[in-house]
Regions:
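Positively charged n-region of N-terminal signal peptides that target proteins for export
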Residues: 1-4
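Central antiparallel beta-sheet cores of small beta-barrel/beta-sandwich binding domains
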Residues: 19-142
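N-terminal signal peptide c-region/cleavage motif recognized by signal peptidases
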Residues: 13-16
Length: 142
């Protein structure tokens, strides 16, 4: 009798697990290269390039997971990652040269411009760069 009950429990557990299928990604895909104009509260105005790549295997429903890379001439590369919920996304980034503590987190709002291109406006905070720092970026997909 115990064997039968254990077997029934095992089958029921397996069916329950199968019912929890991860939903397919249905959110917007922001993959691409973006040209950016930024304003850093310590460094001033700058131009950069952001590359986003969807990680579909880690995305589901309206939630998107991305590789993130910001490149700023004269400063370097800031690899990181981005998590999106619909048109709102959070990013973490860190300068490859970690000696300056130039890393932070940003929050962005995505939209399409009049030409139908994805664009985003980002606010970022860097807790350790030069005693703390913040700034803005406006980026348009090329």
């Amino acid at each position: 009798m115990r064997f039968v009950l254990s077997f029934i429990f095992l089958i029921a557990s397996s069916l329950s697990f199968a019912a929890h299928k991860i939903p397919e990604f249905t959110g917007p895909d922001f993959t691409g290269v973006y040209q950016c104009n930024g304003l850093d509260m310590h460094e001033g105005e700058y131009k950069g390039k952001v590359t986003l790549k969807l990680k579909k295997e880690h995305s589901q429903a309206q939630y998107g997971s991305y590789d993130f890379l910001l490149e700023v001439p004269g400063y370097g590369k800031y690899p990181g990652h981005m998590a999106a919920n619909g048109l709102i996304a959070a990013m973490h980034f860190a300068l490859e040269n970690q000696s300056t503590h130039d890393f932070g987190t940003g929050i962005s709002q995505f939209s399409k411009n009049a030409k139908g291109q994805w664009q985003f406006h980002k606010f970022y905070f860097e807790p350790k760069f030069k005693g703390g720092n913040s700034g803005f970026e406006d980026c348009v997909k090329q």
